[in-house]
Swiss-Prot record:
This is Serine rich endogenous peptide 8. Mostly expressed in roots, and, barely, in seedlings shoots. Interacts with MIK2 (via extracellular leucine-rich repeat domain); this interaction triggers the formation of complex between MIK2 and the BAK1/SERK3 and SERK4 coreceptors, and subsequent BAK1 activation by phosphorylation. A motif (SCOOP motif) lies at residues 54-68. It is found in: Cell membrane; Secreted, Extracellular space, Apoplast. A motif (SxS motif essential for MIK2 binding) lies at residues 60-62. Transmembrane segments: none annotated. One of its GO terms (biological process) is response to wounding. One of its GO terms (cellular component) is plasma membrane. Brassicaceae-specific phytocytokine (plant endogenous peptide released into the apoplast) perceived by MIK2 in a BAK1/SERK3 and SERK4 coreceptors-dependent manner, that modulates various physiological and antimicrobial processes including growth prevention and reactive oxygen species (ROS) response regulation. Inhibits root growth. Keywords: Apoplast, Cell membrane, Cleavage on pair of basic residues, Membrane, Secreted, Signal. Belongs to the serine rich endogenous peptide (SCOOP) phytocytokine family. It comes from Arabidopsis thaliana (Mouse-ear cress). Induction: Accumulates upon infection by generalist herbivores such as Spodoptera littoralis. Induced by wounding.
C-alpha cells in the first residue's frame, strides 16, 4: 500500500513540476517590447566607440600609469 501512495505522490509532484516550469520560463524571458531599450543602449555605446585611428596613445596625465613621454 505504501508503494502505491509513494508512486502516486511522485506522479503528482512530477505533474506539478511539468505544469509550473514552462509557465515560469516563459515569464522570465523578455518580451519583444522589453528588448527595445537594450537595443537603444547598445546604440549609445556604439556611438562612443573609437576606431583604431582615433585611440589616444599619449598616456595618462598623472604619469603614474606609464606610457606617454619618458624623462631621462
Amino acid at each position: 500500500m505504501e508503494e502505491k501512495s509513494a508512486s502516486q505522490l511522485g506522479l503528482v509532484v512530477f505533474l506539478l513540476l511539468f505544469l509550473l516550469v514552462p509557465t515560469h520560463t516563459e515569464s522570465s524571458l523578455p518580451s519583444q517590447q522589453e528588448s527595445l531599450p537594450v537595443i537603444g543602449s547598445s546604440r549609445r555605446l556604439m556611438s562612443t566607440y573609437k576606431t583604431n585611428s582615433n585611440i589616444d596613445f599619449e598616456g595618462s596625465i598623472s604619469g603614474q600609469a606609464g606610457g606617454g613621454q619618458q624623462n631621462p
